[in-house]
Design a protein with these regions (language model features):
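An internal, acidic/charged active-site-proximal segment
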Residues: 45, 50-180
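Active-site-proximal, Lys/Arg-enriched surface segment
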Residues: 1-48, 160-170
């Protein structure tokens, strides 16, 4: 979806796994992803005539190109888990996995917490209807914020010049700490 044109356009999305030591950043893995689209008559935003006019070459089933084609159609969350798993098999160690709000989901939380590593997942919450099990019951993020304000648990950081609060909760049967 193009936020400039306010409509869907043909394109692809890039998914990158990088490692940083605070000074340097190294790309470990990447994959390109596409979507079929919502209109069944215009798969990937193309008419059948446009799809048939595209270059096509039959390749060996075990070729790298076919591997990339399978990745192109794969879910980005599934692929990100595979990328992290592959990096761990290659001996890459990390303390934190920083992800976008799109990837802060139950599947990735389960994967990271099921590893026998001392690592943390840092990601942004979606401020939607997702419920987290807290001492006060099953609450969504806006309700948790209101509750923290009423309990006067919100603090101010002079150094960062912002207000913050946190609460321990449970999500996807895993203990998490939520910061606001």
């Amino acid at each position: 979806y193009s936020h400039v044109l306010h409509r869907s356009i043909l394109g692809f999305k890039g998914l990158f796994l990088c490692h940083t030591d605070g000074k340097t950043q190294t790309m470990l893995d990447f994959s390109l992803h596409g979507e079929e689209g919502k209109n069944p008559e215009k798969i990937q935003g193309l008419t059948s005539k446009q799809r048939n006019a595209r270059f096509c070459k039959v390749r060996d089933e075990k070729s790298v190109v076919n591997t990339r084609i399978r990745e192109y159609k794969q879910s980005k969350i599934e692929r990100s888990i595979e990328m992290v798993r592959h990096a761990m098999k290659k001996g890459i160690r990390f303390d934190y996995l920083l992800v976008d709000s799109w990837f802060t989901c139950a599947d990735l939380i389960r994967f990271i917490t099921s590893r026998h590593l001392e690592c943390h997942l840092i990601g942004m919450l979606k401020m939607g209807k997702t419920r987290y099990r807290t001492e006060a019951g099953n609450l969504n993020a806006p309700v948790i914020i209101d509750r923290l304000k009423k309990e006067k648990s919100v603090r101010y950081s002079r150094k960062l010049n912002c207000y913050y609060a946190h609460m321990d909760a449970e999500y996807a049967n895993r203990k998490i700490r939520i910061f606001f």
